[in-house]
Curated annotation (Swiss-Prot):
Cofactor note: Binds 1 NADP(+) per subunit.
Family matches, as Pfam families: Epimerase
Co-factor(s): NADP(+)
Molecular functions (GO terms): ADP-glyceromanno-heptose 6-epimerase activity; NADP binding
Protein family according to the UniProt entry: Belongs to the NAD(P)-dependent epimerase/dehydratase family. HldD subfamily.
HAMAP family membership: Heptose_epimerase
Enzyme Commission numbers on file: 5.1.3.20
Gene Ontology terms: biological process: ADP-L-glycero-beta-D-manno-heptose biosynthetic process; carbohydrate metabolic process
Protein name: ADP-L-glycero-D-manno-heptose-6-epimerase
Keyword field: Carbohydrate metabolism, Isomerase, NADP
Residues at the active site: 139, 177
């Protein structure tokens, strides 16, 4: 049967297409908006059955033009947290998602979709409960509002609905994201260009570079999506992070040591990297004060209860792999 991936030329969507290909799945309809044409590169090594613009797709899907569709991986969205056009964000992320959901429910199609940890805003608890959800920007609000729709329809849904609140995802095929690409991507490029990585200094009681995030490899994000694809009886909204908060220092230090290893140089401790000027701390910008999360960490209770028991890559493991992949692309 046919599979559909929206946002297929994007970061996570393209990784899902590639992972499906590795299982022998090629009857895939890739849906995206290639106004920014450089994203096509993410699909060059992938096999798909057809490509459709996102506007054409939603109309044809509702008409039943694709016959029996087993599953939709809905990864397409505007993920720019700095976007201020609320009308565009709500049309693109909320209204469009509702249209795809409605058709999946009518046709009995599995619906696996991208939510976001941005829903939690400034919360210090990251559990899938309404009382800790307080988005700080319109991107987070668009995701939050759609999750509320899901909560209302889940009790009566006859087919799978699985939403994943992605934390800080990094990995291959994110180059097109520019400023919204991961910290690992920017650290890699900065070190290659300047010979050092710059991190924020002390802020809000956190030592330089010790502000933390739940950094999750796109490899693990893809594996979780495919686990639920294989288990259509499992529905709900799930955090998708490692369950470990790791400091930005870990990202930067791993980037530096992996690039050193590729240059046949020995690893250095964080202290040695700082002493040698390979990591530099800059004053925390005034513009971000009061708007910056110093800590995120996914509560994995629901995900583990659903039966996903595979370990997640640490920053040291995942970023090392990613830097080696990036080095092979330049």
């Amino acid at each position: 049967m046919t599979l559909i991936v929206t946002g297929a030329a994007g970061f996570i969507g393209a990784n899902i297409v590639k992972a499906l290909n590795e299982r022998g799945e090629t009857r895939i309809i890739a849906v995206d908006n290639l106004t920014r044409a450089d994203k096509f590169r993410n699909l060059v090594d992938c096999e798909i059955d057809d490509y459709l613009d996102k506007t054409e797709f939603v109309e044809r899907f509702a008409r039943g033009d694709f016959g029996k569709v087993r599953a939709v991986f809905h990864e397409g969205a505007c993920s720019d947290t700095m976007e201020t056009d609320g009308r565009y964000m709500m049309d693109n992320n909320f209204r469009y998602s509702r249209a795809v959901l409605d058709t999946c429910l009518m046709q009995g199609t599995q619906f696996l979709y991208a939510s976001s940890a941005a829903i939690y805003g400034g919360s210090t608890r990251f559990v899938e409960e309404r009382d800790v959800e307080a988005p700080l920007n319109v991107y987070g609000y668009s995701k939050f509002l759609f999750d509320q729709v899901i909560r209302r329809v889940l009790p009566s849904a006859k087919s799978q609905i699985a939403g994943f609140r992605y934390f800080n995802v990094y990995g291959p095929r994110e180059t097109h994201k520019g400023r919204m690409a991961s910290v690992a991507f920017h650290n890699f490029n900065q070190f290659r260009a300047e010979g050092k990585v710059k991190l924020f200094g002390e802020y809000n009681g956190y030592a330089p570079g010790e502000q933390t995030r739940d950094f999750v490899s796109v490899e693990d994000v893809t594996k979780v999506n495919l686990f639920f694809f294989d288990h259509p009886e499992k529905s709900g909204i799930f955090n998708l992070g490692t369950g470990r908060a790791q400091p930005f220092n870990d990202i930067a230090s791993t980037v530096v040591n992996t690039l050193r290893a590729l240059d046949n140089q020995p690893p250095l401790t964080l202290a040695q990297q700082v002493e040698q000027g390979l990591i530099e701390y800059v004053p925390f910008p005034d513009a971000l004060r009061g708007k910056y999360q110093c800590f995120t960490q996914a509560d994995q209770t629901k995900l583990r209860a659903a039966g996903y028991d595979a370990p997640f890559l640490t920053v040291q493991e995942g970023v090392d792999r990613y830097v080696r992949w990036l080095s092979g692309q330049v």
